[in-house]
Regions:
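Feature marking well-ordered beta-strand scaffolds used for ligand recognition
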Residues: 15-259
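Sec-dependent N-terminal signal peptides
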Residues: 4-12
Length: 259
């Protein structure tokens, strides 16, 4: 699993940089968390691939592909699943895949890991939409403009207690939201050049902005075990974080040059 984590971090940063800098390529479970599965790959909310147990799942603009990686020296391609248009992100949680598209969020179950099966789709206005999941709720940021089309810049909280019938729970306005990460009652949202936001989500009816770090340009974020991993246009940054105090403390940076 440590090997998987290292690979995921490197490729995630590469994908994030290429996408948001206008280069070819794709874009990058909540937090640096295992998304509720014991052997789940770790990545950001804008990831285009993930690992669940012995299977690797990748997406392109139209398709979900599955691979058996139980033999790491000989991975086996298994199946294509047609997802429709505008597919952007993939996030695993509790035996399901949550797939962000420009038109909505698709839910697929992994009862048959070789061939994920469609459960439902939550539709929204056309925009970019990374997704993370915790408990009975999915957190989705919608961003308008540029390649994302649309005009909405917001956080949608979606009730997924019934996976077959996901429903909008609450919407909050944002500036220019990109990726996001959740850790218990703490939600981080990256606002691109407008900084990084930390929210208290203990009351989803009225989430509270704890702090806005306006000087931290951010594209995606991964909170894990009190370490906050922030992907920016210039590299991969690590911070300690304390949600109760509303503080983060700089640790280190891995610089990433634009390709």
């Amino acid at each position: 699993m440590k090997k998987y984590i290292s690979i995921l971090i490197i490729v995630l940063v590469s994908c994030e940089s290429s996408s948001d800098l206008g280069l070819s390529g794709g874009r990058g479970e909540t937090s640096f968390s295992a998304g509720g599965d014991s052997n789940t790959g770790i990545g950001g909310s804008m990831a285009r691939f993930t690992i669940v147990d012995d299977y690797l799942y990748t997406i392109d603009s139209w398709t979900l592909k599955s691979y058996d990686i139980s033999d790491q020296q000989n991975p086996l391609y298994k199946e294509d699943v047609n997802l429709g248009w505008g597919i952007e992100t993939i996030f695993p949680y509790n035996g399901n895949l949550f797939i962000g598209a420009q038109s909505g969020m698709h839910i697929y179950n992994l009862d048959n890991k070789e061939s994920p099966e469609w459960v439902s789709t939550y539709e929204h206005m056309t925009s970019c939409d990374p997704v993370v999941v915790q408990g009975d709720y999915a957190f989705v940021t919608l961003r308008g403009g540029t390649e994302c089309q649309g005009f909405n810049n917001q956080l949608d909280i979606i009730d997924i207690s019934d996976l077959v019938r996901p429903e909008l729970f609450k919407t909050y306005s944002m500036i220019n939201p990109h990726g996001l990460g959740v850790d218990d009652n703490c939600l981080f949202i990256t606002e691109g050049e407008y900084g990084l936001k930390m929210f208290d989500i203990s009351n989803l009816e009225n989430i509270e902005l704890i702090k806005h770090f306006e000087d931290i340009s951010s594209i995606d974020v991964i909170p894990f075990n009190d370490i906050l991993m922030v992907i920016g246009s210039d590299g991969f940054h690590q911070y300690n974080y304390d949600c109760e105090l509303g503080e983060i403390e700089y640790i280190s940076t891995i610089p990433i040059n634009s390709l």
